[in-house]
């Protein structure tokens, strides 16, 4: 397969995965929050990781081009950006911030977590007002927003305040000026969205609750918005609090707004009830308790299910500081929404029927009644599921499904949830169904399930496009979980007496078949590959505690079979196109992976009271491998894959080496140049183990060795350090914790240069130095030398603690723009560099799209006085911080 096709397939699979986490715009229980103007606010990534917000609105672009220097817009994101601005080519200083490194880093993390990030225009103006003066200005403003904050394109040469990261759409929170030009901007943005058909973009508005809204009513009536975040506070005549207390005392209600939206430029737009997150976030008398919020949500969600979209909260920091029972206010509101939603995002369609089953000594016969459910979507509404046909099927003995065969005895019960376009689901049930769940969320998906007696719990989740899942269950499997996320995937499963099973497939197009038998405590199968034609077959039998099979390849076929007393086995395939087969009996095993230029090797070792097993697999493109089996004896399996070769994998030492107890088989595969010696064993397992040597010629030598071990100790170091950096108010101290891992197998010596006498010590590994100007660090602008981490130098470990930022208290004054100077003292501080990722989806038109995806976890803008980023005189504080910064830097560099 060509590189272009592989990359295209990878993008498609990635888009499916991210889509599974993304916002469901048709849900009734979405939660939106505004962020960017909170006093002492946490980073954007904090709220993405720690909250259940579905939509986060970043505010604000608070200066419009017609009022901004050089015809540029301006921005304010509180304490999240340095006091540094873009300059035009002719040297004019704009009001557009260019030091938003934290937002650059956090946007990709939020996207990966499935959060929808919108950039808000407007808010409370700092000094006077903002407005769009002409149609040309409106069009140019929309083009600028798309180029600067939309997807990165080669033809855009303007500023990128968030780097390569992009937002998911734009929000209009207009509270000043006039109502002209905004419908023009919305229509222009809709046209620009078509340039990126693989992603889904949204447009929202945040009007005041008084009707008609002075600034946004014209735009809402004449252009297509996806979400309307109505501020039901700060206005007594339409306050949500007053409605809860006395509905007759309110002039403008949710009912009035629903009628208005249904006659607007997009009658399908979703209405969000906007509430303050605390008594201090807006007018104190407009704050609602969770009980009061439940009353208004339950009333209007039930009354207008097609228009009600959820709740908006102003704002994130106020919510974080207002904790009820240990939970932030906004998280409580999310729980309120989910409790009131009669059809929450994880809803299921459940039915159980009796099935006749007969069992004989030589064969089993199962009669199954199958219901076929078809799901269809239209551009104007979410998917619907309706029964379309019923059929009667009878199977005797074994049931053949997909590309593998499974056998089952007596079926049980199943719960199926389907949310997708063009989805076909088939479910079979019979007597005594304790609990089973099947969740499918793909496009063009077919699911077939049969269950048998007494399966306490089983779960199957498929999330993919063009996916076919077939599952059969047999006697007494306490718990089973199958998760498939792929395009064109086929899965079949059956088991007997298997306490727990987990299968996860993530690929496109892929086929997976799994068979289980008695006493299987746990099983995990994971396949991840772009544009693949992968077939995975796993068979297990008695007393096999755990088995893991992972395939990651293009056009790969993997077959793994396990039998009695197999403690743990891991097989990883990463190649294109490949066929692999491995078998082992009475074995425990350990995976070891070695990699070379164009070859990958996986070694699986095992030891048991009655057997030793070792599997070595080297992988390269276009390879075929065959594996033979033997029973009841110490065995060693060696599977090699090269370009291209035919390989026979044998099990040694043994008196019999064949699938049917035939004579021993030897192998002479083609091995890439170079020699490798592999010694099984670990420091904690000093037992006899065979030694395998791979010479540079096509000869394979397997010989037993006595008490040879290999030390595979991995050293993990957690480093906590503090450094001084520059924030909008001057110097600040940042404490970070990161983890480094040293692995003897992969570590390589890095040559170091001897220090030059008298020269300053070089920065530590992963750091570099830059020079910049700090206007607030001293009475006059000061040139400072910053020691900063290089890009992606410290990737966060799973247990990484969040950076703690100490900010010097400052008065609530507007941002002071100070021109850089070349004079001043030199101080060494550090900053954090951004990191980026790319998200790919397959939807575009936010108005009429048939998006059907699972949501994941916002906005009553009030006037802000320059935001949270303010400045004070640093006559006294700066000197102390300079001294402290120099001391910390000296300790850090060992001076």
UniProtKB/Swiss-Prot annotation:
- Residue stretches of biased makeup (Polar residues): 426-478, 506-543, 556-577, 590-657
The membrane-topology field of this record reads: Lipid-anchor; GPI-anchor
Domain annotation GH18: ranges:
29-340
Q: What is this protein called?
A: Endochitinase 2
Q: Where is the lipid attached (GPI-anchor amidated glycine)?
A: 866
Bias (Low complexity) = 346-425, 479-505, 544-555, 578-589, 658-692, 699-712
Broad EC category = hydrolase
EC number(s) given by UniProt: 3.2.1.14
Primary localisation category: membrane
Write down the Gene3D superfamilies for this protein, in alphabetical order: Glycosidases
Region: Disordered, residue numbers: 343-712
In its UniProt entry, the species of origin is given as Coccidioides immitis (strain RS)
